[in-house]
């Protein structure tokens, strides 16, 4: 890739990964972000020049400008590049260009679990094939990075459905974890439009194999809608109707055990990640690896080394009011994700009381899923509800934190982190496990709690 490329919004995890990948593939790379952070420091350590002011950036010196969704069309650097006729590509459009440098690409998409599933497959392939690479939306714990370029053989990518940008991509393999109602403004609040976009994605000429979870209603709807016979379509799940069925799921000493029935063979696996949903995610990756020709024994040995992705069920031990307490930090922010996480906590800690500290994320999500929140938020033994993290949205009347728990009783409303800690100091002991959850800044609460 012999190009000079400027990355705008390079302090974000997605664009920073593309900048690193481009550099490792031979491009001359520079980046801009208004605020320096850990990611920009990492890029500078790799020899990438970072600008924090538009002043001094000679846009005319670049062949391509790549920008994140956080960069407005009116941004001076983007406007200048367009006026000069320089090729300007949104993040996913550039990822599509980058993919052409690789022989084979596998895209993971879905409303929930795509980052975790991408990290599982990335960890497997990096052990099974030293020339495999990945670009995903979270820090893969196995590599302590969201990006690794080991060669140009196989590439694992996370394909984002939230803004429909996955339609820019042309992979050979697609894994769909689920299809659910979220980011519906992208799809004009139409479920049929959402399904049509997924159909368009898997119908691309490049796509040869499709794996989808038949336990999910959205995936079943896609199967019913999709009728092309020129692709290899494989369903997986706990359902007896799955092409590859999962069974014998259980936990021993905090290790998840399960079996799958693959082409007439019964194959057993162990996984460090908790919950039925992670078994579903892992199964998709296992099947993809088996179909690529990797040996069962090698996949099984690689799978037990999978540790997932940062902020997905991260485990800590904290001392709270003199008690050693297990604390879990998790990114889940949708009712389905909340329910799955609480179920996983129950499976792993069946004899402990669950205290759920939840920070809702976006007023629009509160509003759009207002009927689904009460059931999900009733599943823990004790709910501590924080104010909604706005993500720069304006407050919507009837969609604040207290509105999503209407009809529930026994929950505690905290007006901030200090208030939540006050409740935790009263409630937590060795017989409790604390799930701290949300996509905003609630992860900081984990750090604030006493070591």
Curated annotation (Swiss-Prot):
One of its GO terms (biological process) is cell wall organization. It is found in: Cytoplasm. ATP binds at residues 110-116. Belongs to the MurCDEF family. Cell wall formation. GO terms for molecular function: ATP binding; UDP-N-acetylmuramate-L-alanine ligase activity. This is UDP-N-acetylmuramate--L-alanine ligase. The keyword Ribonucleoprotein does not apply. Its EC number is 6.3.2.8. Keywords: ATP-binding, Cell cycle, Cell division, Cell shape, Cell wall biogenesis/degradation, Cytoplasm, Ligase, Nucleotide-binding, Peptidoglycan synthesis. Pathway: Cell wall biogenesis; peptidoglycan biosynthesis. InterPro entries: Mur-like_cat_sf (IPR036565), Mur_ligase_C (IPR004101), Mur_ligase_C_dom_sf (IPR036615), Mur_ligase_cen (IPR013221), Mur_ligase_N (IPR000713), MurCDEF_pg_biosynth (IPR050061), UDP-N-AcMur_Ala_ligase_MurC (IPR005758). It comes from the Bacteria. The keyword Repeat does not apply. Its main location: cytoplasm. It comes from Francisella tularensis subsp. tularensis (strain WY96-3418). It catalyses: UDP-N-acetyl-alpha-D-muramate + L-alanine + ATP = UDP-N-acetyl-alpha-D-muramoyl-L-alanine + ADP + phosphate + H(+). GO terms for cellular component: cytoplasm.
């Amino acid at each position: 890739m012999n190009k000079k490329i400027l990355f705008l919004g390079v302090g974000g995890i997605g664009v920073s990964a593309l900048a690193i990948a481009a550099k490792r593939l031979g491009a001359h790379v520079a980046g801009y972000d208004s605020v320096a952070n850990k990611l920009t420091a990492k890029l500078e350590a790799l020899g990438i020049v970072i600008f924090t002011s538009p002043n001094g950036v000679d846009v005319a010196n670049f062949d391509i400008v790549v920008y994140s969704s956080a960069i407005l069309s009116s941004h001076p650097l983007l406007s200048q590049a367009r006026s000069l006729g320089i090729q300007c590509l949104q993040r996913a459009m550039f990822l599509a260009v980058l993919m052409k440098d690789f022989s084979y690409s596998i895209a993971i998409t879905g409303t929930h679990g795509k980052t975790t599933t991408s990290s599982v497959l990335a960890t497997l392939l990096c052990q099974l094939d030293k020339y495999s690479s990945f670009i995903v939306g979270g820090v893969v714990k196995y590599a302590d990075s969201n990006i690794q370029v080991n060669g140009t053989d196989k590439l694992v990518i996370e394909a984002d459905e939230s803004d429909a940008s996955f339609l820019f991509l042309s992979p050979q393999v697609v894994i769909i974890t689920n299809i659910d109602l979220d980011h519906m403004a992208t799809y004009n609040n139409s479920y049929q439009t959402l399904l049509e976009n997924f159909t368009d994605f898997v119908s691309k000429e490049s796509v040869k194999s499709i794996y989808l979870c038949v336990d999910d209603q959205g995936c079943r709807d896609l199967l019913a809608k999709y009728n092309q016979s020129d692709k290899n379509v494989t369903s997986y799940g706990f359902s007896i109707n799955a092409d590859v069925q999962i069974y014998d799921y259980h936990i021993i000493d905090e290790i998840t055990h399960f079996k799958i029935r693959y082409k007439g063979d019964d194959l057993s696996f162990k996984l460090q990640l908790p919950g039925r949903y992670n078994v579903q995610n892992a199964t998709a990756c296992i099947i993809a690896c088996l179909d690529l020709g990797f040996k069962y024994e090698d996949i099984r040995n690689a799978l037990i080394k999978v540790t997932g992705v940062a902020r997905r069920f991260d485990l800590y031990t904290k001392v709270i009011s003199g008690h050693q307490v297990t604390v879990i930090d998790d990114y889940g922010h949708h009712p389905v994700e909340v329910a799955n996480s609480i179920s996983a906590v129950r499976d792993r800690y069946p004899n402990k009381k669950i205290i759920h500290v939840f920070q809702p994320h976006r007023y629009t999500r509160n509003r759009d899923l207002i009927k689904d929140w009460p059931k999900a938020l009733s599943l823990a033994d004790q709910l501590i509800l924080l104010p909604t993290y706005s993500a720069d949205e304006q407050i919507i009347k009837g969609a604040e934190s207290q509105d999503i728990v209407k009809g529930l009783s026994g929950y505690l409303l905290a007006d901030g982190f200090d208030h939540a800690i006050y409740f935790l100091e009263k409630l937590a002991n060795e017989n409790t496990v604390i799930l701290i959850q949300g996509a905003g800044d609630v992860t900081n609460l984990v750090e604030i709690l006493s070591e």
